[in-house]
Amino acid sequence: MELLPHEKQVVEYEKTIADFKEKNKENSLLSSSEIQKLENRLDRLKEKIYSNLTPWERVQICRHPSRPRTINYIEGMCEEFVELCGDRTFRDDPAVVGGFAKIQGQRFMLIGQEKGCDTTSRMHRNFGMLCPEGFRKALRLAKMAEKFGLPIIFLVDTPGAFPGLTAEERGQGWAIATNLFELARLATPIIVVVIGEGCSGGALGMAIGDVVAMLEHSYYSVISPEGCASILWKDPKKNSDAAAMLKMHGEDLKGFAIVDAVIKEPIGGAHHNPVATYRSVQEYVLQEWLKLKDLPVEELLEKRYQKFRTIGLYETSSESSSEA
């Protein structure tokens, strides 16, 4: 597993404890109570490091190569999954995976953005950057869910919509705008979870829902830290400053009324314990579905409409107000 800079001290300590345990099998260098003390110290070290992460370090966790992807969540959460492909206009976009899913006996339409897990699959999935046909595919499946009375789960994980010439020629902006318009009035419950990167319109095109949640170390922003740094300072070394200024993580966005919930990750991030992460996301989805399933359609749509009409809280100082 690839090590992030802030993880090195923890891994070295874990290796030391593992070495002691191995040597103990032959020589009994340390008693079990002494080993336990070392493990307790390791727990305190982890708590100290992971409770004081900078926004940029959390972005690195969010982008970790071993972080679970949409396909992993499908395997970890669903008893059944039948994939559906194509947008019925141009082609299938592998950056979107969607289909009929069964979770704890309840049927859903699960639609997620997929980056891939190695060089070959990442190139095949275009690194999770959707083309117009990806947004059209997602909307086609969402409308199918509405037709069959199925709740929808959107899993968001993209560095942004594909910015290439071919995507623009096929109507990238139009495809995203159409999704915003159509999903806002879809007559079935929609639950959105940002599981990794949630960047710009590429994320928003699949993030219109009745509830929007984020994993603890995921981010949701109008631009990546690198993009922000290149525009504001023209200096890639300012990525860390940009990540802090963008307020792109769950606790800030919940305070701004942009997301509704932050789902806790295992210590160190989802890649350290994927199974526990699948369980947390599954619990959240089922819990929210129970709240939404009996709402009259008119009330469901009105609440969704008002949610996005009033999204975001901000304050103005009394000084600026008086000047105005």
From Swiss-Prot:
It is found in: Cytoplasm. InterPro entries: Acetyl_CoA_COase_a_su (IPR001095), ClpP/crotonase-like_dom_sf (IPR029045), COA_CT_C (IPR011763). Pathway: Lipid metabolism; malonyl-CoA biosynthesis; malonyl-CoA from acetyl-CoA: step 1/1. It catalyses: N(6)-carboxybiotinyl-L-lysyl-[protein] + acetyl-CoA = N(6)-biotinyl-L-lysyl-[protein] + malonyl-CoA. One of its GO terms (molecular function) is ATP binding. It holds the Pfam family ACCA. This is Acetyl-coenzyme A carboxylase carboxyl transferase subunit alpha.
